[in-house]
Amino acid sequence: MSEKGRLFTSESVTEGHPDKICDAISDSVLDALLAADPRSRVAVETLVTTGQVHVVGEVTTSAKEAFADITNTVRARILEIGYDSSDKGFDGATCGVNIGIGAQSPDIAQGVDTAHEARVEGAADPLDSQGAGDQGLMFGYAINATPELMPLPIALAHRLSRRLTEVRKNGVLPYLRPDGKTQVTIAYEDNVPVRLDTVVISTQHAADIDLEKTLDPDIREKVLNTVLDDLAHETLDASTVRVLVNPTGKFVLGGPMGDAGLTGRKIIVDTYGGWARHGGGAFSGKDPSKVDRSAAYAMRWVAKNVVAAGLAERVEVQVAYAIGKAAPVGLFVETFGTETEDPVKIEKAIGEVFDLRPGAIIRDLNLLRPIYAPTAAYGHFGRTDVELPWEQLDKVDDLKRAI
């Protein structure tokens, strides 16, 4: 253990990071298709590099106009992020956009459209007719460390990234560019966050900016201090924090010109910042028939309601599926010794209150809607800036009654 205590670190990135551009494009294409045809089956992957965007994957949809307009959807999202000039290293209006999308495999579709329960076992329940789109395991987590019931390091890192984008877009720091990263290291004592140890903020900027005289003080005042004042965490001492702004020096060459980007390469940023486990599946570009996405959302919904109901101070839940089967093959609940009720009772109550078949998750969270583009940056969980159905605390009373 360090003399400074147990140190835990999480990172976030801005929407202009190359990987996040790809997540945003994939989810914008998904939303456009779902808006026109809620039953669209979508698995879209994006790659960006200098001057080019490649969008590939599998789509089955009746939304012919939206499908034909994918190129314009791609350009619009890039411009919205802020890449609108070659001076910034990328321009959504002039970059090359290559589309290579085919249809969903009929072998996969048969298991999703007619699950094993209906096809082989003769189940009559309509919710037994939709099978999982793949095998896999998904985790959800919640902890009472923040109002949004998220681990503090990732919650703070996301707030810093959102603030970086906010001061760029609203003109407070107009010399900032879209690409950026944040990292937060917090000291813990007995699982309580006690001290903000280190904050790293790296941001792309215009070429003529003086790092020491302008960028460093501006980031401290307009980004870090604003976020810390808003956070006002009761146990966290930030008085001795070490702040590193652009520790490599200048950061002019960024975005796709600085690094190639791919959909699904920021899965820890997307979830719990490494504080909780991850099943390995990415989210962006996937319609909710893919349990990688919908079941991970459902598990966050479960975990958040368990903590909000006072059944545990923190909880991690895992669910697992077999491709083509509706019912989960496994459910695991871990309360880390913080439970206020018997963990066996908590697991039983979860099974009674939440229907974790894919069709039921889609129904209960109303997932066949164009709600995914805002999740492509700043995390899918614990969001305070957008309303997401898996963040609702609508099962607290049901869990209490079930216990």
UniProtKB/Swiss-Prot annotation:
Q: Which GO terms describe its molecular function?
A: ATP binding; magnesium ion binding; methionine adenosyltransferase activity; zymogen binding
The subcellular location is:
Cytoplasm
* InterPro entries, per the entry: ADOMET_SYNTHASE_CS, S-AdoMet_synt_C, S-AdoMet_synt_central, S-AdoMet_synt_N, S-AdoMet_synthetase, S-AdoMet_synthetase_sfam
Q: Per the annotation, how and in what number is the cofactor bound? A: Binds 2 divalent ions per subunit.
Q: What is its EC number?
A: 2.5.1.6
* Superkingdom of this protein's organism: Bacteria
Q: In which pathway does it act?
A: Amino-acid biosynthesis; S-adenosyl-L-methionine biosynthesis; S-adenosyl-L-methionine from L-methionine: step 1/1
Which reaction does this chain catalyze? Answer: L-methionine + ATP + H2O = S-adenosyl-L-methionine + phosphate + diphosphate
* Uppermost EC category: transferase
- Residues binding ATP, per UniProt: H17, D179, G180, K181, K250, F251, D259, R265, K266, A282, K286
Single GO biological process annotation from the record: S-adenosylmethionine biosynthetic process
Q: Which GO terms describe its cellular component?
A: cytosol; peptidoglycan-based cell wall; plasma membrane
Region described as Flexible loop: spans on this chain:
104-114
Query: Per its database record, what is this protein's job?
Result: Catalyzes the formation of S-adenosylmethionine (AdoMet) from methionine and ATP. The overall synthetic reaction is composed of two sequential steps, AdoMet formation and the subsequent tripolyphosphate hydrolysis which occurs prior to release of AdoMet from the enzyme.
Q: What is this protein called?
A: S-adenosylmethionine synthase
